Amino acid sequence: METRFGASPPYTVGVEEEFQLIDPRTRALTPKIEEVLAAGDGELPEGTLASELSASCLEVRTPAYASVAELARALPALRARVRRLAERSGARLVSAGAHPFSPAAEQPITGKPRYRKVDEEMGWPARMQAIYGLHVHVAVPGGEEAVRAVSALARHVPLFIALSANSPFWEGRDTRLASVRAKVFGLIPRSGLPPRFASWEEFVRHVERLVRAGSIRDYTFCWWDVRPHPKLGTVELRAPDAQTDPGRTAALAALCQCLAAAAEEFEPEDPLLTEENKWRATRHGLEAELYDFSGQRTVAARRAAEELVGRLLPVARELGCEAELEGVLEISRSATGADRQRAVLAREGSLKSVVDYLAEATA
């Protein structure tokens, strides 16, 4: 398997943010991806903008940065440029895990052969994927380091979901979940928590078996919550909902970077209990009670976030992301994105008002 591990300095970081494209009049999703991509041609560095499965989704990719502080400074300006491109194309930009009311099955699939094939092979689950995530990439030196980082991140996927929860509504209904995206994404094959790999070679053998079986064409068809990405030389965290506030994006990126760098400090944990924690975080967000492996106790998600940040602060100082990691504390002490969306609905009485709030807050 071709890899680029070690091609970049270790623990450089970049993100991919998936944005909703919104009709300014109806506030519904609008399939304007081709118009936005055309508007961005020559305006932004090649590869910055990309399509995804849904034609109402715009993926925005940052370059790799030496520090999360650099990423944090770049994100607002990049979002502003992309927002202007969307507006020129007749769309508004929204960052949240799911649209409050647009029916998922009505969203057209993009014309990319990859996604046409996915639609053909999966059927209904593919049509439900009108969801929007934050992906964090952290460069690692080699395959073994990638496997260890995946393991360390996997045990903390529930906490990432709790911190990022930003999708309470689905097709006009309050799901009573903090992250409906986490459940909808689980409809597709090879999603959810990653298998536990003892070595890089075991990961390679697993992918090769799936290729020989005709299940996948390459490892990028394994859509786990966190995975090695050898073509980029990174580990990729895929669990968080898209964040309305770019400051929260930076905070989650810092947490991911620190965990990847400190991976050897975290032993693999019982996947069944991690799955249970993931459900609790999906349902309750930061109000969840999570099983704490180290203390064999139940701990509030907010407290778990504070304890993890405290443990990682020495690593953050070495990486230069202490301020951004402390942003996780700010998230843990405030309302989630899901809470804020519900508050807007309670105050305004309209899901269109929720869309307006999200569009205005997507800074």
Curated annotation (Swiss-Prot):
Catalysed reactions, as listed in the record: L-cysteine + L-glutamate + ATP = gamma-L-glutamyl-L-cysteine + ADP + phosphate + H(+)
Keyword Ligase: yes
EC number: 6.3.2.2
Keyword 4Fe-4S included in the entry's annotation: no
Gene Ontology BP terms: modified amino acid biosynthetic process
Alphabetical UniProt keywords: ATP-binding, Ligase, Nucleotide-binding
Pfam families: GCS2 (PF04107)
Alphabetized InterPro entries for the sequence: GCL_type2/YbdK_subfam, GCS2, Gln_synth/guanido_kin_cat_dom, YbdK
GO molecular function: ATP binding; glutamate-cysteine ligase activity
Family to which the UniProt record says this protein belongs: Belongs to the glutamate--cysteine ligase type 2 family. YbdK subfamily.
Function field: ATP-dependent carboxylate-amine ligase which exhibits weak glutamate--cysteine ligase activity.
Protein name: Putative glutamate--cysteine ligase 2-3
Organism in which the protein naturally occurs: Rubrobacter xylanophilus (strain DSM 9941 / JCM 11954 / NBRC 16129 / PRD-1)
Species classification: Bacteria, Bacillati, Actinomycetota, Rubrobacteria, Rubrobacterales
